[in-house]
Every structure is written in structure tokens, then in C-alpha cells.
């Protein structure tokens, strides 16, 4: 690779590995870019944390990584964090900061029955900005909200090589099981596309699953293509976490399947 070649470096940040759903779409669209991924497992799950804590931890991690690997963009691949951290991040960095917003607008456009389900974390479904999105784009729809931490944990376990507990999943989704005309589901947490097939088994009436990951990848491309980028000599993608964890050795062995070369623990507390 020519040292003068401009190869964008993009950081994906989440409290867990849900952001993989966004990262994989970006890598599919832009395979030759350099990707860093940081998951704040010491602070997981963000849906259970106060806003100030989420802001502090996100800023600390992004600033630490940026000092070592100058970044061209940061993707907050977490719906919960995106509701609170984007303004302070944009104040701290002069690079594109891209958030994740539940796809309520496209869901309202594709639904045939005007009955939509928003599946997200407990923190996200309570945010005022969800009310604003529904008022702006889906006033003519019935929008069910289901906040869950259990599905986040199930997705985390799947990424780490465990089979999905369909009984627990079905139980968590049971409030919607009898809604025969619920035809559209907004996957309002980046973890949920990772278990979309299993969710579909539990809710067979749903025909449309709205995942913003591909749109985010296109947004990254639009913002960084032909821009003044950092010149990077490193050729590999790297992952960071904020604490050691029990299955770390097995997790490291599977990194190459996702296109990463190494996992490093960083301290942000």
C-alpha cells in the first residue's frame, strides 16, 4: 500500500458488540477502509446507566483512542448512547460524529397495516426524542413500544458463540405475539439485527424489519469520500474493550471472522 494513500480510519463505539451490525454494513460497502471498534463492557449495559455516566465514558474512550490513532469519523453504534452523547462529542471533536436513530420514518412508509413495533432498550423507548420521531413521522400509525435488556444479553451471547435461547426470546416478545396485524418491526438497538432471524421465528406475522445499518454505512461514505483524511500506514483493524471478561480467549480467536486482528483492553474509569 502506498504510504500516501488516504485510507479513512473510522471508530465504532458501543457498550457491547451490537455495533457489529453497523460495522459489518460499513465493511461490506467500504472494505478497504480501516476500522476500530470499542465496546465499553465495563459499563455495559448503557440502558441501565445515567446520562452523565454514558457521556463521560463515551467521551473518555473516544478521546483516548483518538490520541493513539487519529480518527476521521466516529460512529456511535448504540441507540441508547446516541440519544445523549452526540452534542458533547461534536463539541469535543472536529470530525464527523454519526449516531444511530431508530428507523421510524421508513417504517411508517413501508407498513401496510399502520401497526408498528419499536423494539429497543428500556432507556431508548422512554426518551423524549422517540415521542418526537413518532409525532413527526408516524402520527397515522399505532406504534407499540417494547423495552428490553434481555434481548441485548441474548445477542451478546450469540456473538460469543452460544446458541440463542428461543424460549427466553419468545417469552420476552410475548406481549406482541397476539398482534396479528403488527407487520413492521423497528430494530431500535444495534444488537437486534444480530438476532433478527430468531426474532422472526417468534413473531412470524412481521413482514418488514427496519434496520438502519445500511443507511449509516452510506452516510459514512458520503461524509468521508474525497475529504481531507488522515494518512494511515497501519493495515489492520483493531478492537478495544474496557475490561477483561471470562470468555476473552475464545472471543479473540473469533476476531478474524469479523475482520479484526487484535483485542486490547483500555481503562477509562
From Swiss-Prot:
The active site is at 78 (proton donor/acceptor), 189 (proton donor/acceptor). One of its GO terms (molecular function) is glutamate racemase activity. Its EC number is 5.1.1.3. Substrate binds at residues 14-15, 46-47, 79-80, 190-191. GO terms for biological process: cell wall organization; peptidoglycan biosynthetic process; regulation of cell shape. SUPFAM superfamilies: Aspartate/glutamate racemase (SSF53681). The keyword Cell wall biogenesis/degradation applies. It catalyses: L-glutamate = D-glutamate. It holds the Pfam family Asp_Glu_race. Keywords: Cell shape, Cell wall biogenesis/degradation, Isomerase, Peptidoglycan synthesis. InterPro entries: Asp/Glu/hydantoin_racemase, Asp/Glu_race, Asp/Glu_racemase_AS_1, Asp/Glu_racemase_AS_2, Glu_race. Pathway: Cell wall biogenesis; peptidoglycan biosynthesis. HAMAP family: Glu_racemase. Provides the (R)-glutamate required for cell wall biosynthesis. Belongs to the aspartate/glutamate racemases family. This is Glutamate racemase. It comes from Haemophilus influenzae (strain PittEE).
